[in-house]
Amino acid sequence: MRRDPFNDVVQSALNSPRKAVVLLMVLGAFGAGYYVGVHGLPPALMPPGASVPGASQDNTSVDFSPKGGCTEAVIAELRAAKTSVHMQAYSFTSKGIIAALIEAHRRGVKVTLVNDKKAADEAGSKVSQAAEAGLDVRVDGAHAIAHNKIMLIDGRTIITGSFNFTNQAENSNAENLLVLHDKSELYQAYEANFQRHLGHSESYVVSQGKVERRGR
């Protein structure tokens, strides 16, 4: 019978506590290496700037930042939009998302943006660009902060989460983004909330090259 070298090592280790400890350390390292090779590094052990992969289940998907695909997920939904986009935002500086919104508008999609009033004028804000492109842009100043980060698309898709529509949220912040499809009762609740804030918001219009606000 052929001898098994690994079995010999195990038998030797069983006769020596010191060898047993070394063997356990080696096996532990091997097992950890195999797990990481197959499954990737566990999220708890990832460095702070690393991205965590998203997941999807039952018409629902989730993505995480930094650099975990949140902006890409938003843009993909906007490119698929056919009739309407209702958007609420606090800070809005993402070049990719404003481009996708303008592209949707040019396809004939009705795009309505309700942005926090103070944040609309922050450095890098895309609110004026949205207004200049012809989108229906409003500003909500009825609250300390209008902090909703939501998109409602075509009466069936909800995008929500902590993720601001900004470059910083994509590349630097720890955020989450949830995309839900065909959740009709949830959609109706989000749509009612959107309409409530739209009702007390001011229009944000462009006049003679300068963005001005005016009442509804």
Predicted feature residues:
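Short, small/polar-rich loop/turn modules that mediate ligand/substrate recognition or access, typified
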Residues: R2-F64, G68, E72, V109, ...
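Second-shell loop/turn segments in exported
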Residues: T60-S65, H86-A89, T112-K118, E175-L180
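Primarily the HKD phosphodiesterase
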Residues: V74-D136
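Extracellular/periplasmic catalytic domains that process cell-envelope and extracellular macromolecules
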Residues: R79, R106, A130-A131, H143-A146, ...
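Short, structured motif recognition centered on aromatic/hydrophobic residues
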Residues: Y90, I150, Y190, F194
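Solvent-exposed loop/turn segments at secondary-structure junctions
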Residues: S91-K95, K117-D121, H143-A146, T157-I158, ...
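Short Gly/Pro-enriched turn/cap motifs at secondary-structure boundaries
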Residues: R138-A142
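Signature of lipid phosphatidyltransferase scaffolds
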Residues: I158-R216
